[in-house]
Amino acid sequence: MFKAIVSADTLGAALDSVSVLVDECKVRLDEEGLTIRAVDPANVGMVDLELSASAFESYETDGGVIGVNLDRLEDIVGMADSGQLVHLDLDEETRKLHISLDGLEYTLALIDPDSIRQEPDLPDLDLSSEIVIEGADIDRAVTAADMVSDHIALGVDPDAEEFYVDAEGDTDDVHLELDREDLIDLTPGEARSLFSLDYLKDMNKAIPKDAEVTMELGEEFPVKMHFDFAEGDGHVTYMLAPRIQSD
Amino acid sequence: MFKAIVSADTLGAALDSVSVLVDECKVRLDEEGLTIRAVDPANVGMVDLELSASAFESYETDGGVIGVNLDRLEDIVGMADSGQLVHLDLDEETRKLHISLDGLEYTLALIDPDSIRQEPDLPDLDLSSEIVIEGADIDRAVTAADMVSDHIALGVDPDAEEFYVDAEGDTDDVHLELDREDLIDLTPGEARSLFSLDYLKDMNKAIPKDAEVTMELGEEFPVKMHFDFAEGDGHVTYMLAPRIQSD
Amino acid sequence: MFKAIVSADTLGAALDSVSVLVDECKVRLDEEGLTIRAVDPANVGMVDLELSASAFESYETDGGVIGVNLDRLEDIVGMADSGQLVHLDLDEETRKLHISLDGLEYTLALIDPDSIRQEPDLPDLDLSSEIVIEGADIDRAVTAADMVSDHIALGVDPDAEEFYVDAEGDTDDVHLELDREDLIDLTPGEARSLFSLDYLKDMNKAIPKDAEVTMELGEEFPVKMHFDFAEGDGHVTYMLAPRIQSD
């Protein structure tokens, strides 16, 4: 059983954060809320989404897992005007999700969860640096790096107490330094890792420009980024595996 | 002889309603105003446009029929700013239409009307149901149906006093019900017909979101939709032939 | 040595006026400011750009010539918000230009100036007519002409004291007449020349709609167009060779 009412904006933001990495996903339902964990086919980028029951206008479930085509569901939710409510009602027998918004009813066929790539474990890493940064600054760094290269180094200089971004192209380079003044917060430690820009660009699409993003970095380790949405009732964690440094 | 001045907005709306179905058309001129009737090459969708002389700032003609390339004429009219006036002046000898707006003169070669597909007769059908609906609701129904299918059923349930829309896809379905409260007016009768979504999407493009659209429906019969524009001085009727129900 | 600070808007406008004609260019630096001269590969359209030192927040150079990839530089400058300042700093040893905006540093590899097409001489022509016209009117003429033809005639009728534009297509024609009332200023003389519309469309892209453009025209002679930007501290001259009249 699953029956819920939620604002289209909240549901849309939740779906967007997952759909930048995968087309289909398992949605876990329990009384606390809904969670989605997914990893891209190459096992490089992972997402962990939590949308707590308090993010919903009403929320009832006795638990379960459903398989969802994200594009379809996003298209339907995208038809709603901002602030409109979306009603979700699971039909367990037919394995269909009834979605209604303002008189419009959409019957979405669910996917067998067993046919969907297994959910990843997000490893509990002990990363040396923690940076709290505005979403807009991540966007700026990613956009600039994309002009010159297809990979990007993220690092922290503990002496200078700076977070930095490096992208080296064949002829041109991009460099961005943000110190304590420019950041929301910084817990410095030796850290530098190289990442595929494609994945970071995808994740960046789902990060609100005004979000406070907490970034955890290490030495040639994955980066973790987390941020809240829906006034704190929604939470996204991205994890991106490093590329091997070529030098 | 044909000499007229009309606002670019009015002329643009008139042309748009026809150009969604055909590229070329005959324009009939008489002292009452201008009329265009056209049917698409597959004989599925028809349009009947009336723009009365009172829609013009000035209007003079002694009658006649001209053949027009709609894309060309729309491009020219599209150059005008909102509220700007377009001057039309027919040169009978050269069979060219002189169009001027704000100092710019465009000479449009007309098409021999005999080379254009014959104008259809819009049959006088006795349809059982009449629905008066906002253009925005048609847009919503068409957009949602388009997510799942390439055809759409429009119907009326006389007992429930509801107008409904059904689209059945391979896996997903869309359903919309609008009762008296949601509609502007309803004269219910048994009615349900299936239509090609492509045609309805084209017609929908030309229906203003804030228009009151009168829709006449029957049992496996064509649908008629009409609406006014230019403050009532312009009137469009669309007629769309049904598809054969597959079940 | 070259070290300067300039608003992104001013630098962007300067680069745009050149990049509509060429991809790479030589930038001449001296204490008066920066100048760029370039001609397109077919030797049909030329540009002469001057951006005086007073257009910059700060400007220091001991002279020199650098070769620049315009697309790259435009992309970087395009990342700035309106009103933001761009810092430019030339590293003579590495032949790289350091560009920084709001903490972001971009290192642009310069091009060997000797590998770039030679700068043209803009001939000092004695043209019979001078028209001062709003950029918006050039845009209107070019857009309308483009509907019917790939070339455009610009002329002056000294008796009627009118500037006119003619474009003749296979079936349709466009004509625009602007008299003293419509123009900012007119010094009439016999003038009519035919031009390639493609070039004029490119130049038109870089002409601000609210610019006062001075156009010099002759009988089957090149047209010169000049306008100021950056509150008079920037100046662009375009010159476009005529096409041979086909009749």
From Swiss-Prot, chains A, B, C:
Subunit structure, as described in the record: Homotrimer. The subunits circularize to form a toroid; DNA passes through its center. Replication factor C (RFC) is required to load the toroid on the DNA.
Regions that span the bilayer: none
Keyword Transcription regulation in annotation: no
PROSITE patterns linked to this entry: PCNA_1 (PS01251)
Gene Ontology molecular-function annotations: DNA binding; DNA polymerase processivity factor activity
Segment forming the signal sequence: none
Protein name: DNA polymerase sliding clamp
Lineage of producing organism: Archaea, Methanobacteriati, Methanobacteriota, Stenosarchaea group, Halobacteria
InterPro entries registered for this protein in UniProt: DNA_clamp_sf (IPR046938), Pr_cel_nuc_antig (IPR000730), Pr_cel_nuc_antig_C (IPR022649), Pr_cel_nuc_antig_CS (IPR022659), Pr_cel_nuc_antig_N (IPR022648)
Biological process annotations from GO: leading strand elongation; regulation of DNA replication
Coiled coil region boundaries: none
Record's function text: Sliding clamp subunit that acts as a moving platform for DNA processing. Responsible for tethering the catalytic subunit of DNA polymerase and other proteins to DNA during high-speed replication.
Domain of life: Archaea
Keyword Signal applies: no
